[in-house]
């Protein structure tokens, strides 16, 4: 178990490890506001989304029997602001892996361009990230390691930025964004300037298309892709959702070389609730992952003479 904890520590606090730093979600088609500031305010209302993920259920320290499986929780909210010619958004996330905890806050703006029956959002956000580790629960080989000595109980605070562009039409969308673009570094106070954490720039490419087939009355099929990379590793999700009368949905997702996911959900008026279960296909995990998503949209009245742009229901 000490080896596993060492992997967690190095993943979060070493600039030499290649694992991606941004949290992972199966409900990526509902999570544009967290990874792409260009999507802020593109839906017709104030949209609040929450996602909770428990990864590798039942993963415990074999000595203490304490749960060490990663847990991630986030809440995002975005809304159109007419006098700003765009939208604003905020996101709060907490990612916990064994003794390591990350707290992230994002705040940003998106400028909207009307392109016929399409719309393009170009946005940016600033983010503040607090990374902390419970050193009392570690059993390091070398307690004088400068990385560990430089860590305070309050953790380290890192600022960075993200940019993104989100293009949508009534039945499809395509988007590109980059997070942690400044690649901020942090050094330990007692380690002679040795860098023990560095943000790595992440890139996102997403797209989806609503398909209506005459043979399936009331159904809307939405294939989509979600690609994330830090130029060292690549995550690619291929999704297919089927929605019936905008009330219930189900779907499948394949995360290449990692997991197959089953998704179900219901919608009642402006409330949507979804659940997914990841079945691992890699050798890293023997147990699956649970994820719950909830979203509520507060409608905003617009001038009837103004053209509306409502894309896919996943904004």
Predicted regions and their residues:
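Positively charged n-region of N-terminal signal peptides that target proteins for export
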Residues: 1-4, 115
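Sec-dependent N-terminal signal peptides
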Residues: 3-13
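Sec/Tat signal peptide C-region and signal peptidase I cleavage site
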Residues: 15-19
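Subset of outer-membrane beta-barrel
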Residues: 20-315
